[in-house]
Amino acid sequence: MSVALSGELQGAIYAALTADAALVALVGSEIYDAPLPSGGALPLGEHVTLGEEEVKPFDTITSSGGIHNFDVVVHSTANGFGAAKDVAAAVGAVLIGANLALVGGHLVSLRFLKAKAKRGVAPELRRIEMRFRAVVEDI
């Protein structure tokens, strides 16, 4: 089943990001796997959210799994891109090639696909959308 490990993969990604000292030094505890409450103020500085995910089957004759393309988004209230890019680099350092443990499956690979830096309007002045690909195999 191609989406069977989606929740477990998201949990492992979140755990890896929140456990990384370099990333936490940049954003503190401002790492979210759910949308921020509507109407609430954005955290000042930078924060990270887990974004959208698209899953496609990755099945062979002997096994089944999924290709998970997912976004991690860096948000910033700063005027320039510098701080947001530092956070994006830290996110990449955590995830690219990571060996995340999955109880119900095996992470075959985790790689970076692309990033897009955008200017926004106050209060979110900068945003970097990072896309990653995880290939997982059910066990």
Regions found by a protein language model. Name each.
Residues 93-139:
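Acidic-leaning, charged glycine-interspersed low-complexity segments
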Residues 64-78, 126-136:
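Oligomerization/assembly interface segments of phage tail-like spikes and tubes
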Residues 52-57, 78, 114-119:
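Short, well-ordered turn and helix-capping elements at secondary-structure junctions
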Residues 57-60, 78-79, 137-139:
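Short, cysteine-centered beta-strand-loop-beta hairpins and adjacent loop/turn segments enriched
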